[in-house]
Amino acid sequence: MHMSNARPSKSRTKFLLAFLCFTLMASLFGATALFGPSKAAAASPDDNFSPETLQFLRNNTGLDGEQWNNIMKLINKPEQDDLNWIKYYGYCEDIEDERGYTIGLFGATTGGSRDTHPDGPDLFKAYDAAKGASNPSADGALKRLGINGKMKGSILEIKDSEKVFCGKIKKLQNDAAWRKAMWETFYNVYIRYSVEQARQRGFTSAVTIGSFVDTALNQGATGGSDTLQGLLARSGSSSNEKTFMKNFHAKRTLVVDTNKYNKPPNGKNRVKQWDTLVDMGKMNLKNVDSEIAQVTDWEMK
């Protein structure tokens, strides 16, 4: 029977008192003080880098964790069709482009008929050094990892099957020394030259540096006419950053889908990402979550 004037039970009274206390505490201290920060609130682009790597990138490129996180998203879309780039430290695959195995964040290669000066050996040498080798070498790293292979001239010849070799690389995904070696090699082979070329022209923006890095790792930093060096030589001499980058992107678009750099039309869409950000005026890649989502919203072929 329902009695509107009945006395509340003791349990109900305790509940009401507890609720009132909770409400008072929440109003005084805030929900965050009671529960701690939410996972979403605690998440920061800086968390995607070790403190050492983050400081290294800041010192040498002038860009912070948020900017590098966005650069890596833009690079990883055409490389892996995925913005979650941190999953690919242990990536390994023979993509049958005659460049050997493709490895890690920036697609280091072991070498082949179309790549006689690969960057893979540098990565393995850096790993051997990071693990404490007194005289680091690519061969030393292979031995350390139990990989059957050796340097043959400038090419890293792997004798294990793809399943065995890539299985061992995938196990390095969370290896701190491997991650350190990955960023050191990435910087030495591609990032340093890209930053130098930007600064020589008076440019320091994240989009310009990122676009140059993307070009270098995709088409080579120096050497032939399709490399970053070759494209820069054909992009004019404008001191206006936007004007220069529009010219640079136009030149890159002409060659980006040739020579197995990308499968058409993925290359054109790759360049368009950066070019659209230039048009948007989002050169510093700060607070651009929606813009990154927009420019990477294209279908890989």
From Swiss-Prot:
Q: Which residues of this protein are catalytic?
A: E79, D97
Where is this gene product found?
Secreted
Source domain of life is Bacteria
Q: Which GO terms describe its biological process?
A: carbohydrate metabolic process
Cellular component (GO) terms are:
extracellular region
Q: What catalytic activity is recorded?
A: Endohydrolysis of beta-(1->4)-linkages between D-glucosamine residues in a partly acetylated chitosan
Which Pfam families does UniProt cross-reference here? Answer: Glyco_hydro_46
For whether the record's keyword set contains Signal, the answer is yes
Which InterPro entries does this chain map to?
Answer: Glyco_hydro_46, Glyco_hydro_46_N, Lysozyme-like_dom_sf
The EC number(s) attached to this protein equal 3.2.1.132
Sorted alphabetically, the keyword list is: Disulfide bond, Glycosidase, Hydrolase, Secreted, Signal
Name the Gene Ontology molecular function terms of this record.
Answer: chitosanase activity
Q: List the disulfide bonds.
A: C92-C166
Q: Please give the CDD domains that the UniProt record associates with this protein.
A: chitosanase_GH46 (cd00978)
Query: Family per UniProt?
Result: Belongs to the glycosyl hydrolase 46 family.
Q: What is the purpose of this protein?
A: Aids in the defense against invading fungal pathogens by degrading their cell wall chitosan.
Q: What is this protein called?
A: Chitosanase
Organism, per UniProt? Niallia circulans (Bacillus circulans)
